[in-house]
UniProtKB/Swiss-Prot annotation:
Gene Ontology annotations of biological process type: cellular respiration; Mo-molybdopterin cofactor biosynthetic process; nitrate assimilation
Native species: Pseudomonas aeruginosa (strain UCBPP-PA14)
Name of the protein described by the UniProt record: Periplasmic nitrate reductase
Cofactor binding description: Binds 1 [4Fe-4S] cluster.
Main location: periplasm
SUPFAM superfamilies, sorted: ADC-like (SSF50692), Formate dehydrogenase/DMSO reductase, domains 1-3 (SSF53706)
Length: 834
């Protein structure tokens, strides 16, 4: 075979990705010849279906199926390469057990909670859903119904769900699975800056001198970005990489400063760095005086456990967790003074010389620094504090909001930013950083949505972990989940998740593509379309919004989540779900369906079907008779335009490889809050953190506080959970790709060889991982990619046959309500198979 240089480069990239998973090099063949006249393939762009990096891929279709993908060479994010998951995108939709018809638990021809799943029609599915919703609403009100959504929802799916629940059904009990991964990042941004989402962008990678990873294994979780970090590190001799984690992983291979610290002591390290910056005279005084104020956050705030838990009863400020008082720089300096190098080395276990070298990276005024973090910071009972403390360091030094200087929170899902955060599908949020507790914010949403004043409830709804508890307690009775698998991904499954789903008083609906663990525990399963089987939009970690067209049809009777939400809204009239006093404010809405009120309101339905680009299918346009995606997007965009969240016109995104908001006058923003880059910054001001009225960011004084649970005599090991390169989240897609499944078929218990020896275990021994809440069986791994220190084990959560979340603790950050999956106590027992 004769290859051009371009073909060779593409084949080589494919080979590298394949080799990472131990796959045959022949994978290159599917990514070589792409000319349509040779292959009869039709190629279109789409963002990758997996992580929050937002890689763009070229998708090939033929005879109504996706048959190949390759990296999009025109994309700024990934520049033509993909990780190993991205190279197998063409296979994720075609698992042999794809769901194609609604399935209801039935016995003797009718619904039975203990019955077997039997196929029914969509009409029957919506009939029983409407019956259950209406009965719960009539008996107990809006608090009795809820929804669990996703950072994998498209922008308009999340927006439609938000409208349906918060305005239509008047229930704020809607929360995304991003609560498990990004809620602490959200609250960190909101507290420090008054606005959500990163100020920097991926361009920082090529502009910086230093990378510091805090609880982020980018080599496996953001591998395409890691390739850019690696290129920068190997291309510029002055560049340094520091990696901090509770165990050694693949990102350590590039580290100049590798640091394994004891769980929870990242808080101590962060405060030490701030102290070092102050004591060494490295504070950027001019920046701090002009752009920063100081606050002391509430302490002893509890652990987000049930109110009757002894730890919650003991906490002094559990009900005031998100409060603070103003202090000055001098008081802040006194606060961090006890966090000395000696104390930090002793309590964290990191050698003093490495800690000092890390602090000097930040303190050196000649060095630019990018701090990256993911779940190690966010899945943390003090995750919001950890986010605030890293911002402290960048603010004290002025290393922020400019090329190469950036604190950068990386997201895990393809639209955790674009949908969960920006659309506001959390139980306390509305679009564009508005919140349900603020009367002016509710008024803004009600006006845009054209519903009566008072429609949106002011009480915050149940967050993700609370939803499980309320199902368990019988408070929440009808529950619909889409694009999520909480029976596998949620914490403390056996005590808090499963009992609520199987509670005979509750009715649970799961919309999904495959029969996941969650689907198998549900009462009604709805088959969903996925990825390019529908038109969609995602928003990635650098504020980049990306669109794609529908390229193929979904199999059987599978329907998009958008269609399901909008079609279901036809089953309710305002008389059935709104009180008389609310209808009295808008008598013209009396008797109308929620579909009429929310989706045929003169805004969502104002774009005709003829606006659809020629040559593309759109099943929702066919179903509803208008360009619903465009209408939903433009209505949603009204929340942010003119308020620092500006989005471009709908059609611009189909032409571009994504645009980073705010987009003003057709120009995207790469660095927020900095004059010359951000159109919202006043001329001559240099920097304005305009999320707060005084345009200043806040530096927080926050202490070290211990975790909710730590090893003891009965449970002597720390347990951390997480992911691996080859699988994504719960593996419901990647485990159905033969090559990825073959590469990593099972979750393993990674542990230190000396711990294994002391327990008379060896590599491959089958063990039980046991906590106070549950247990699983798995095999020991003492070699390979993950190298825990003594006293800690790591188990990934992708394996549906080894549900590690039977074991985890449902402690959460009291401010963000995000679960700490990185710290609980377990013991390891050898299985006696005799």
């Amino acid at each position: 075979m004769n290859l051009t240089r371009r073909e060779f480069a593409k084949a080589n990239a494919a080979a590298i990705a394949a080799a990472a998973a131990g796959l045959p090099i022949l994978v290159r063949a599917s990514n070589l010849v792409t000319e349509a006249d040779v292959t009869s393939l039709v190629w279109n762009k789409a963002p990758c279906r997996f992580c929050g990096t937002g890689c763009s891929v070229m998708v090939a279709t033929r005879d109504g199926q996706v048959v190949a993908t390759h990296g999009d060479i025109k994309a700024e994010v990934n520049r033509g390469i993909n990780c190993v998951k991205g190279y197998f995108l063409s296979k994720i939709m075609y698992g042999s057990d794809r769901l194609t018809r609604p399935l209801l638990r039935m016995k003797d021809g009718k619904f039975d909670k203990q019955g077997e799943f039997q196929p029914i029609s969509w009409e029957q599915a919506f009939d029983i859903m409407a019956e259950k919703f209406k009965a719960a609403l009539k008996a107990k009100g809006p608090e009795s119904v809820g929804m669990f959504g996703s950072g994998q929802w498209t922008v308009w799916e999340g927006y439609a769900a938000n409208k349906l629940f918060k305005a239509g059904l008047r229930s704020n009990n809607i929360d995304p699975n991003a609560r498990h991964c990004m809620a602490s990042a959200v609250m960190g941004f909101m507290r420090s800056f008054g606005m959500d989402e990163p100020m920097g962008c991926y361009d920082d990678i090529e502009a910086t001198d230093s990378f510091v990873l805090w609880g982020s294994n980018m080599a496996e979780m953001h591998p395409v970005l890691w390739s850019r970090v690696t290129d920068r590190r190997l291309s510029a001799p002055q560049v340094k990489v520091a990696v901090l984690s509770t165990f050694e992983h693949r990102s350590f291979e590039l580290a100049d400063l590798p640091m394994v610290f004891k769980p929870q002591t990242d808080l101590i390290i962060l405060n030490y760095i701030a102290n070092h910056i102050i004591e060494s005279g490295a504070v950027n005084r001019d920046f701090v005086e002009r752009h920063v104020r100081f606050a002391h956050g509430a302490e002893d705030i509890g652990y987000g456990l049930r109110p009757d838990d002894p730890l919650e009863k003991k906490a002094k400020n559990a009900d005031k967790a998100n409060t603070w008082s103003d202090i000055d720089f001098k008081a802040f300096a006194e606060f961090v003074k006890p966090y000395t190098l000696e104390r930090t080395a002793r309590e964290s276990g990191v050698p003093a010389e490495r800690l000092k070298a890390l602090a000097e990276l930040y303190a050196d005024p000649k060095r630019k620094v990018v701090s990256f973090w993911t779940m190690g910071f966010n899945q943390h009972t003090r995750g919001v504090w950890a986010n605030n403390l890293i911002y402290n360091i960048h603010l004290l030094t002025g290393k922020i909001s400019e090329p190469g200087n950036s604190p950068f929170s990386l997201t895990g899902q393809p639209s955790a930013c674009g949908t969960a955060r920006e659309v506001g599908t959390f139980s306390h949020r509305l679009p564009a950083d508005l919140v349900v507790t603020n009367p002016k914010h509710r008024e803004t949403a009600e006006k845009i949505w054209k519903v009566p004043a008072g429609t949106i409830q002011e009480k915050v709804g149940f967050h993700a972990v609370q939803q499980s508890r309320m199902l368990n307690d019988g408070v929440l009775n009808v529950y619909w989940t889409q694009v999520s698998n909480n029976m596998q991904a949620g914490p403390n499954v056996m005590q808090e998740v499963l009992p609520g789903w199987r509670n005979p008083d509750n009715f649970v609906i799961v919309s999904d593509v495959y029969p996941t663990v969650s689907a198998q525990a549900a009462d009604l399963i709805l088959p969903s379309a996925m990825w390019v089987e529908k038109e969609g939009a995602f928003g990635n970690a650098e504020r980049r919004t990306q669109f794609w067209h529908q390229l193929v049809k979904a199999p059987g009777e599978a329907k998009s989540d958008l269609w399901q939400l909008v079609e279901f809204s036809k089953r309710f009239t305002t008389d059935e779900v709104w009180p008389a006093e609310l209808l009295a404010k808008a008598p013209e809405l009396k008797g109308k369906t929620l579909y009429d009120v929310l989706f045929r309101n003169g805004q969502v339905d104002r774009f005709p079907a003829s606006d659809l680009a020629k040559g593309y299918a759109n099943d929702e346009v066919d179903a509803f008779g208008f360009y619903i995606q465009k209408g939903l997007f433009e209505e949603y965009a009204a929340f942010g335009r003119g308020h620092g969240h500006d989005l471009a016109p709908f059609d611009a995104y189909h032409e571009a490889r994504g645009l980073r908001w705010p987009v003003v006058d057709g120009k995207e923003t790469r660095w927020r809050y900095r004059e010359g880059y951000d159109p919202y910054v006043s001329k001559g001001s240099g920097v304005q953190f305009y999320g707060y009225p005084d345009k200043k960011a806040i530096v927080f004084a926050l202490p070290y506080e211990p975790p909710a649970e730590a090893p003891d005599q009965d449970y002597p090991f720390w347990l951390a959970t997480g992911r691996v390169l080859e699988h994504w989240h719960t593996g419901s897609m990647t485990a159905r790709v033969p090559e990825l499944y073959k590469a990593v078929p099972d979750a393993l218990v990674y542990m230190h060889p000396e711990d294994a020896r002391q327990l008379k275990l060896r590599r491959g021994s089958e063990v039980k991982v046991v906590s106070r809440r549950g247990e699983i069986r798995a095999r020991v791994e003492t070699r390979g990619r993950n190298k825990p220190p003594q006293g800690l084990v790591f188990v990934p959560f992708f394996d549906a046959n080894k549900l590690i979340n039977k074991v985890t603790l449902d402690a959460t950050d009291p401010i963000s309500k995000q679960t700490d999956y990185k710290k609980c106590a377990v013991r390891i027992e050898l299985l006696n198979l005799a």
